[in-house]
Amino acid sequence: MLGLIQRVRRASVEVDQQVVGEIDQGMLLLLGIQKTDTEASADKLIDKLLAYRLFADADNRMNCNLQQVDGGILVVSQFTLAADTKKGLRPSFSSAAPPAQAQQLYDYFVTQLRSRHAKVATGIFAADMQVSLVNDGPVTFMLEMD
């Protein structure tokens, strides 16, 4: 499971010109699901996301996590994160989970995350989405769970 996280001042996602999810200060998560991912992978990523220290403390050091700053998290599914770009000029998506598996794991991920954190917003799985954000820093990290 792949998670590209960005610290944001605010972020939103639109589908068909309608805002379907938005947050103020917090984290934008672009979530890529691979064939080998399981519910255990999702649980590990949630643990890491909620504990990951990417927000500044009083000394302006990245020592605070999402819960400590009462931040929101906007989850956006993005299968292109699972692309293999090592060869050629066209990405291969052979390691990406098939749609049914990815949908099941995405739904599981969001349900589990919502059970542990109050401020969760989402896009719509497999929709054509427009994501807007004000990146804070910028601070961006790629997380990968087995």
UniProtKB/Swiss-Prot annotation:
Main localization (coarse): cytoplasm
Pfam families: Tyr_Deacylase
Location in the cell: Cytoplasm
One biological process term in Gene Ontology: D-amino acid catabolic process
Catalytic reactions on record: glycyl-tRNA(Ala) + H2O = tRNA(Ala) + glycine + H(+); a D-aminoacyl-tRNA + H2O = a tRNA + a D-alpha-amino acid + H(+)
Transmembrane segments: none
Keywords, ordered alphabetically: Cytoplasm, Hydrolase, RNA-binding, tRNA-binding
Enzyme type, top EC level: hydrolase
GO (cellular component) term, any one: cytoplasm
Assigned protein family: Belongs to the DTD family.
Subunit: Homodimer.
Free-text comment on this protein's domains from its UniProt entry: A Gly-cisPro motif from one monomer fits into the active site of the other monomer to allow specific chiral rejection of L-amino acids.
Name used for this protein in its record: D-aminoacyl-tRNA deacylase
Organism: Cellvibrio japonicus (strain Ueda107) (Pseudomonas fluorescens subsp. cellulosa)
